[in-house]
Design a protein with these regions (language model features):
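Conserved, structured core segments of small domains
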Residues: 1-93
Length: 93
């Protein structure tokens, strides 16, 4: 699963990530992540849409199912500050 953090949390860039990331590592579910900077969309032909501007970072986790992934949100600084975290399944294969 991947958590996509949106930029609507109170506190913005001042959020403390280390306790949350440490807990995910301790439970063996952390698979990586990063902040996301500015970018651009490319398309071979036709008009190109603007890149999604409100996603500021991602975290990959191992989870049994969507319910387990939701449980792993507890302690996520964006989630705890009232911001939006989008959960997406990363299909195997």
């Amino acid at each position: 699963y991947v958590f996509l953090m949106h930029d609507d949390a109170a506190g913005g860039s001042g959020l403390d990530w280390e306790p949350y990331l440490s807990r995910l590592r301790e439970h063996g579910v952390f698979q990586g992540g990063s902040t996301i900077g500015e970018g651009q969309c490319e398309r071979k032909s036709g008009s190109t849409p603007a890149p999604t501007a409100h996603i500021t970072g991602f975290i990959r986790v191992t989870a049994e199912d969507m319910a387990h992934a939701r449980d792993l949100l507890h302690g996520n600084p964006v989630y705890e500050a009232g911001g939006t975290v989008e959960i997406r399944e990363l299909p195997n294969g």
